[in-house]
Regions:
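GH16 jelly-roll
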Residues: 1-274
Length: 274
């Protein structure tokens, strides 16, 4: 991997077979979330999702953002950040009962908003420290296409690229999902692997996405690669946490003393090959 200097911050380490330029990044210098770059993900499949919140964001003053879990209605919740949105997440405005032709509004999607950042190809990198108890709150760094699963060929409707997911202590999962989230769901290059100890507890995850395929990295080493079903459309970035229980309708209630936990991120960077 080749060293790429970022003034005032730790460097990136990028694949050596290409020259790179930095095209988008957030170093999380604070003191507040940069709303020109990020939105909160608050909806899931067309309605507000009880697991998500716009609370729990903390800047530590050392160029880190912390995504903390918090409490709402007696249950744990946690934040998700995104630079765009899945078209199917957005709730439909039920007050708009007629379409432009005076008919009942049959369009299934809500009103789409302009994304903060969408990009195609390049190297996507995140440096982070994991939460203490990932079995109760997992974390992820990933990209997704707004129309995933809407065409037979994922090249033209995009995919989900999980650059990193953390469900278990000292383990990460990496790989792609395509075909949507129903009967045609499938995955490629998806692997789980143990994390090696680092001196400061931080890990660096990266994805080199090109017309030829995907190569995934953890701490400078290749952990997975695939050349099948390459997305040819721009995708948005997500930096997320999620507490357990909501997808099975049994969210974890706060019993006794509240237990804090946080996913800590140093930076997110996107590079283009030149």
């Amino acid at each position: 991997m080749k060293r790429y200097e970022v003034e005032g911050h730790v460097p990136s380490y990028l694949p050596e077979d290409k020259e790179w330029k930095l095209v988008w990044h957030d170093e999380f210098d604070g003191p507040d979330l940069d709303r020109e770059k990020w939105d909160f993900r608050l909806n899931f499949w067309g309605k507000p999702f009880d697991a998500y919140t716009d609370q729990g964001i903390v800047f530590d003053g050392k160029s880190n953002i912390e995504l903390h879990r918090s409490v709402r209605n007696g249950c744990y919740v946690s934040p998700q950040l995104q630079t765009g949105s899945n078209s199917f997440d957005i709730p439909k405005d039920v007050s708009s009962v007629k379409n432009p032709w005076g008919q009942d509004d049959i369009w299934p999607l809500g009103e789409l908003s302009k994304p903060k950042f969408m990009h195609r190809f390049g190297y996507y990198e995140c440096r982070c420290r994991f939460q203490k108890d990932p079995a109760r709150m997992w974390s992820a760094f990933w990209t997704q296409a707004p129309g995933i699963g809407t065409t037979y060929d994922p090249a033209w409707s995009g995919i989900e690229s999980d650059i990193m997911e953390c469900f278990l202590v000292d383990e990460a999962t990496t790989g792609n999902i395509m075909g949507g989230y129903g009967k045609q769901f499938r995955n490629e290059g998806r692997v789980s692997y143990p994390l090696k100890k680092t001196p400061d507890g931080y890990h660096v995850f990266g994805m080199d996405w090109s017309e030829k395929g995907y190569v995934f990295y953890c701490d400078g080493e290749v952990v997975s690669a695939t050349s099948e079903n390459v997305s040819m459309v721009p995708q948005f970035i997500l930096l997320t946490t999620e507490v357990r229980g909501y997808r099975s309708s049994t969210p974890e209630k706060v019993e006794g003393e509240f237990v804090d936990d946080a996913f800590i991120v140093d930076y997110v960077r996107v590079f283009d090959a030149v």
